[in-house]
């Protein structure tokens, strides 16, 4: 038998059986479900190849309202004994894939990187742009929630255990896994919406072109609508929402995989829009070539977050519904963590660039000194009135506010 491996359909059947048997056996919720398979088989043989309603309630702890649905799944009172005694014979050829221990390293690395990026952003806003603005506080809130998301993902990794397959876990693990994953699924659209809105508010504050402001309105409205729809959809996918306690009562109202793919695709669309919105303002600036290249790069880093969003959609498509090949959602957690952190890091890049120019102008700019927000405005006015050679106003503005024009709240 050791040379044979169960086919995909057989594996999927065993995975499904594990969830139903676990939900119907509260007395054995602490045991690995493959062991519970054997307990059922041994019990049925010892009981004259029978498994009655009373047996389930008294000896396995099945709730009375769960007995009939449980028996129906396995073919009724006659079929259930046959199925459950045959199931242990499948165990020797079932695969036992392990979870990749990637969540904790990702959490540690990105916590350090994102903390540094957000810290430098706030320092830049305070030192160069004259103070921390409302959109910076929103980004800071998004950063805090991203850290919480990562910490919950670490817990999700812990409760999932070392193995992917449901039959290699206990029902207690399964219930906690369902609970934590639902929390993560609801958290994601809220955090992503918060980060995107903070960036759009920044663009709105620095925009002078009407069509750019309208683009901000449209993208912001789409982002908010998508986030609200995602949260509501995830909450309505299960009724009651604590479906792990009502697993045999058909709590699954619809498959959330397709909506998650749609919401993810809309977020990518907004990523592209946010990437394009500042470009007209950047290209209109009369900067030295090296400075313009740096500005374009700083505002284009969001493309990296777009790529991460694409990989997250791939992970949802691959891992959201269990199959004979995959039965763990930890890769979705991993790509979501990567996407959220990269979005924050990329959103902080323009501010970090301004801070670098402020303290090291010879490295990132041909200008000999740093500027304050008030100095940039007064300098351009005096240049026009006196005719003296001055640094272009547009270049100062970019250094002060990380944008093509001086923010409205700075001047």
From Swiss-Prot:
Q: What happens when the gene is disrupted?
A: Decreases cAMP levels following exposure to C.elegans. Decreases trap formation following exposure to C.elegans; formed traps exhibit abnormal morphology with a single hyphal loop.
Q: Where is the composition biased (Low complexity)?
A: 372-389
Q: Which residues face the membrane's Cytoplasmic side?
A: 121-134, 203-227, 284-292, 350-411
Q: What induces it?
A: Induced following nematode exposure.
For side Extracellular, which residue ranges?
1-99, 156-181, 249-262, 314-328
Name a single GO cellular component.
Answer: plasma membrane
The residues that cross the membrane are 100-120, 135-155, 182-202, 228-248, 263-283, 293-313, 329-349
Q: How does it sit in the membrane?
A: Multi-pass membrane protein
Q: Where in the cell is it found?
A: Cell membrane
Q: Which residues are glycosylated?
A: 321, 326
Tell me which family the UniProt entry assigns to this protein. Belongs to the SAT4 family.
Q: How does it assemble?
A: Interacts with guanine nucleotide-binding protein alpha GPA2; to activate adenylate cyclase and positively regulate nematode trap formation.
Described purpose of this protein according to its UniProt entry: Receptor that senses nematode-derived signals at the cell surface and signals via adenylate cyclase to positively regulate trap formation for nematode capture.
**PANTHER family membership:** INTEGRAL MEMBRANE PROTEIN-RELATED, PTH11-LIKE INTEGRAL MEMBRANE PROTEIN (AFU_ORTHOLOGUE AFUA_5G11245)
Q: What is this protein called?
A: Receptor GIN3
């Amino acid at each position: 038998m050791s040379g044979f491996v169960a086919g995909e359909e057989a594996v999927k059947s065993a995975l499904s059986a594990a969830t139903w048997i676990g939900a119907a056996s509260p007395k054995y919720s602490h045991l690995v479900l493959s062991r519970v398979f054997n307990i059922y088989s041994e019990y049925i043989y010892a009981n004259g190849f029978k498994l009655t309603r009373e047996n389930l309630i008294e000896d396995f702890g099945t709730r009375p309202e769960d007995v009939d649905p449980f028996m129906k799944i396995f073919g009724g009172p006659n079929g259930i004994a046959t199925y459950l005694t045959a199931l242990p014979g499948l165990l020797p050829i079932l695969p036992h894939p392990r979870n990749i221990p990637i969540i904790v390293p990702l959490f540690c690395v990105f916590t350090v990187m994102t903390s540094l990026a957000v810290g430098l952003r706030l320092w830049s806003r305070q030192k160069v742009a004259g103070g921390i603005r409302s959109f910076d506080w929103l980004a800071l809130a998004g950063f805090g929630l991203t850290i919480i998301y990562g910490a919950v993902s670490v817990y999700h990794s812990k409760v999932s255990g070392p193995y992917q397959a449901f039959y290699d876990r206990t029902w207690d693990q399964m219930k906690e896994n369902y609970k934590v994953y639902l929390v993560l699924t609801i958290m994601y659209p809220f955090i992503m919406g918060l980060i995107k809105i903070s960036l759009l508010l920044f663009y709105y504050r620095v925009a002078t072109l009407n069509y750019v402001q309208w683009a901000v309105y449209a993208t912001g409205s789409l982002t908010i609508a998508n986030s609200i729809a995602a949260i509501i959809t995830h909450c309505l996918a299960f009724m009651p929402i604590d479906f792990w306690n009502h697993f045999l009562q058909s709590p699954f109202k619809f498959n959330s995989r397709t909506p998650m793919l749609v919401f993810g695709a809309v977020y990518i669309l907004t990523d592209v829009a946010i990437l394009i919105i500042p470009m007209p303002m950047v290209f209109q600036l009369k900067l030295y070539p090296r400075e313009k290249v740096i500005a374009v790069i700083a505002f284009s880093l969001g493309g990296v977050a777009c790529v991460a969003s694409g990989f997250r959609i791939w992970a949802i498509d691959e891992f959201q519904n269990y199959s004979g090949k995959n039965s763990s959602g930890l890769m979705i957690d991993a790509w979501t963590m990567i996407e959220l952190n990269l979005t924050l890091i990329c959103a902080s890049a323009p501010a970090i660039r301004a801070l670098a120019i402020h303290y090291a102008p010879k490295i990132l700019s041909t200008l000999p000194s740093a500027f304050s927000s008030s100095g940039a405005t007064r300098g351009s006015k005096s240049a026009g009135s006196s005719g003296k050679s001055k640094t272009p106003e547009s270049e100062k503005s970019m250094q002060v506010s990380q944008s093509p024009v001086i923010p409205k709240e700075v001047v």
